[in-house]
């Protein structure tokens, strides 16, 4: 068969395979066109689940007579004109394929009128060449699209359509998602002549709850927690259900990027990760969230149905969503600070600044007067999307690019000081990181500790250590008097069976990890390096709590904890590396109460080592269950950084097992 150009109708039908999956796909494409045209009212009529009729009527700007023919042509659009427009899309549609694809698999009629025209015009395409016929019609300002007999000329596609009830259920879900995206638009949905849904316009935020309740139900409203966060050009707002409500709402996930409904895996993963400690694997979070981002930083042209996007700063977006949702969930269940307010005498509760209950969100921008994205002050509508290239987001610069390296630095911190694995510098310090990477001071300090405290050196607090003869050293983890010996196996959740001093011993991995954290958190003379948080956490504190922070500001700074105190609130801006993966809200809450106990006694000072040990007891373990290799790595780190602990392990860490009773039980002679 020779190469030939496909007829227009066949080419459009091929394109329709991606655009028109089912009647709900048609409704989505046509309603999004109405929104791009600036419509404030949209009426949707469906017959027989969309197989017989889909009618979309709006009061938008309309299409002029001269453009009706182009409107039904392939790759014809008023949304974009240049590559710059494609890289900063602010409209719902932009490919110019929807109307041509739909008209190729149905009998489509387009009727429209602009405010400048005295009469309306109607267009429809038919035949092998999809020739467009235009004739006068009666119609108010706006557009009406009628799609009759969907898939009438493609029997194979029509055969795969489901029942009328199933297809209408999908249409109803699409309308619900669109109604949640645009509260300012009134939408009605009829099926077989009956009014099914009616969403009245909610021009201000005080009326949002009514539509939210109509779509998501009373259960979601009862358990909804408001989210409102901003970081640079990233903004997220909406509602998430607390874990109790999420368990009752398994199919309540609505997410929007620049008012475009999404089913993006990165977004879902970030939200799911925020819930991970509060929901089981078979449960799903419930949320209605709106993410606004610079259009230059997101590519929506990656999915045929535009259900997925690609973020240029994917990690930044993921962490932003994760921390916003996690902070709100933690706030809902955060305990009090254990202190009382001098004014009221009541317990002071920990309050996140980005909760409505905590007052105004100081990260938020001034409120807008409409519900459209403020990209350069332009409202997306037909024929104006090309102005997006002049958006105010042109100066977007991502912050803290070195954040992605923190995991590598943390791994480098815990690497064993093996002479074969890394080179020593002139000072004898072992640092297994590239030469061009900036090493945090605490890493250098801890590396120095491992070399200043060799295994055969007696620690000051280890005078009671065993004086048994040293066993031959076969390997770093072989049985020896100055080590933990060899890890034989691991018993869930956190116990390791060791070959220790030619005997058997059971070791608590969680206790060993706590001692290791205490050493890592003990500051040197230079102090621990502060690692900036992606999103500073703001706290509303009482005068007594602010005085606690002010009195111990130097101590906290030495630990790498950067707290900015201003007026009646404080902002947590940075923490040391070992604390970055912790629940900072609960940890700082307990820390203020701990420091307050010392402030009541003027002569008593907080010792850094004691504070490091206290914080280590409050940290959550990084491992839910330990593997054999993880246990070996942990003990190697403890032997290297805490040699005195390996020489004289406390009873809470290691327990010698008496195997003589087992041997006697096995003797039957």
Swiss-Prot record:
Entry-linked PROSITE patterns: DNA_MISMATCH_REPAIR_1
Instruction: Tell me which Gene Ontology terms the entry assigns under biological process.
Output: mismatch repair
Instruction: Please give the SMART domains that the UniProt record associates with this protein.
Output: DNA_mis_repair (SM01340), MutL_C (SM00853)
Supply one GO CC term from the record: mismatch repair complex
Q: Which GO terms describe its molecular function?
A: ATP binding; ATP hydrolysis activity; ATP-dependent DNA damage sensor activity; mismatched DNA binding
Q: Which residues cross the membrane?
A: none
What's the superkingdom here? Answer: Bacteria
Pfam families for the chain = DNA_mis_repair (PF01119), HATPase_c_3 (PF13589), MutL_C (PF08676)
* InterPro entries named in the record: DNA_mismatch_repair_CS, DNA_mismatch_repair_MutL, DNA_mismatch_S5_2-like, HATPase_C_sf, MutL/Mlh/PMS, MutL/Mlh/Pms-like, MutL_C, MutL_C_dimsub
- Polar residues biased stretches: 448-468
Q: Where is this region: Disordered?
A: 354-402, 448-479
Q: List the disulfide bonds.
A: none
Q: Which UniProt keywords apply?
A: DNA damage, DNA repair
What PANTHER family does the record tag this protein with?
A: DNA MISMATCH REPAIR PROTEIN MLH, PMS, MUTL, DNA MISMATCH REPAIR PROTEIN MLH1
Q: Which family does it belong to?
A: Belongs to the DNA mismatch repair MutL/HexB family.
Its annotated function is as follows: This protein is involved in the repair of mismatches in DNA. It is required for dam-dependent methyl-directed DNA mismatch repair. May act as a 'molecular matchmaker', a protein that promotes the formation of a stable complex between two or more DNA-binding proteins in an ATP-dependent manner without itself being part of a final effector complex.
Identification of the protein by name: DNA mismatch repair protein MutL
Q: Which organism is it from?
A: Pectobacterium carotovorum subsp. carotovorum (strain PC1)
């Amino acid at each position: 068969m020779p190469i030939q150009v496909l007829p227009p109708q066949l080419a459009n039908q091929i394109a329709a395979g991606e655009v028109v999956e089912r009647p709900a796909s048609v409704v989505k494409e046509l309603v999004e066109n109405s929104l791009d045209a600036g419509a404030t009212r949209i009426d949707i009529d469906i017959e027989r689940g969309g197989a017989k009729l889909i009618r979309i009527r709006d009061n938008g700007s309309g299409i002029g007579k001269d453009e009706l023919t182009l409107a039904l042509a392939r790759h014809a659009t008023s949304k974009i004109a240049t590559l710059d427009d494609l890289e900063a899309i602010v409209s719902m549609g932009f490919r110019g394929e929807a109307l041509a694809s739909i008209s190729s698999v149905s009998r489509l009629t387009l009727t429209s009128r602009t405010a400048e025209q005295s009469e309306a015009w109607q267009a429809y395409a038919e035949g092998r060449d999809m020739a467009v016929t235009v004739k006068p019609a009666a119609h108010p300002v706006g557009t009406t699209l009628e799609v009759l007999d969907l898939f009438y000329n493609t029997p194979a596609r029509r055969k795969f359509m489901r029942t009328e009830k199933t297809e209408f259920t999908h249409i109803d879900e699409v309308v619900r998602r669109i109604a949640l995206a645009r509260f300012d638009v009134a939408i009605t949905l009829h099926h077989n002549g009956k009014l099914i849904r009616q969403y009245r316009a909610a021009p201000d935020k005080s009326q949002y709850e009514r539509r939210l309740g109509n779509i998501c139900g009373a259960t979601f409203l009862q358990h909804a927690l408001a989210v409102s966060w901003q970081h640079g050009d990233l903004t997220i707002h909406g509602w998430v259900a607390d874990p109790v409500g999420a368990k009752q709402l398994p199919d309540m996930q609505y997410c929007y990027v620049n008012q475009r409904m999404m089913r993006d895996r990165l977004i879902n993963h970030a939200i799911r990760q925020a819930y991970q400690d509060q929901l089981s694997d078979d449960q799903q979070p419930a949320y209605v969230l709106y993410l606004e981002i610079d259009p230059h930083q997101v590519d929506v042209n990656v999915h045929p149905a535009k259900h997925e996007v690609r973020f240029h700063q994917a990690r930044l977006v993921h962490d932003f969503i994760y921390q916003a949702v996690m902070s709100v969930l933690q706030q809902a269940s955060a305990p009090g600070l254990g202190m009382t307010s001098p004014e009221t005498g009541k317990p002071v509760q920990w309050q996140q600044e980005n909760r409505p209950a905590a007052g105004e969100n100081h990260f938020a921008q001034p409120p807008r007067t409409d519900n459209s994205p403020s990209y350069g002050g332009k409202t997306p509508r037909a024929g104006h999307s090309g102005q997006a290239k002049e958006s105010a987001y042109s100066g977007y610069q991502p912050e803290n690019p070195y954040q992605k390296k923190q995991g590598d630095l943390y791994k480098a911190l815990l690497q064993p000081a093996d002479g074969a694995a890394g080179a020593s510098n002139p000072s004898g310090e072992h640092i297994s990181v590239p030469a061009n990477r900036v090493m945090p001071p605490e890493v250098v300090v801890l590396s120095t500790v491992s070399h200043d405290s060799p295994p055969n050196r007696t620690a000051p607090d280890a005078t009671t250590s065993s004086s048994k003869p040293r066993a031959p050293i076969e390997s770093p983890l072989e049985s020896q008097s100055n080590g933990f010996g060899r890890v034989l196996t691991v018993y869930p959740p956190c116990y390791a069976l060791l070959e220790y001093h030619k005997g058997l011993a059971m070791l608590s991995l969680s206790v060993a990890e706590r001692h290791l954290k205490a050493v890592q958190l003990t500051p040197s003379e230079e102090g621990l390096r502060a690692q900036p948080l992606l999103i500073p956490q703001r706290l509303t504190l009482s005068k007594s709590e602010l005085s606690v922070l002010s009195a111990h500001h130097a101590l906290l700074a030495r630990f790498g904890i950067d707290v900015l105190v201003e007026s009646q609130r404080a902002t947590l801006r940075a923490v040391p590396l070992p604390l970055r993966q912790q629940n900072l809200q609960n940890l700082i809450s307990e820390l203020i109460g701990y420091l307050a106990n010392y402030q009541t006694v003027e002569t008593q000072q907080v010792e850094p080592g004691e504070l490091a040990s206290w914080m280590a007891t409050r940290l959550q373990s990084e491992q839910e269950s330990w593997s054999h290799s993880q246990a070996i790595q942990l003990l190697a780190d403890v032997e290297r950084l805490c040699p005195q602990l390996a020489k004289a392990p406390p009873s809470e860490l290691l327990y010698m097992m008496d195997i003589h009773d087992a041997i006697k039980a096995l003797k039957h002679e």
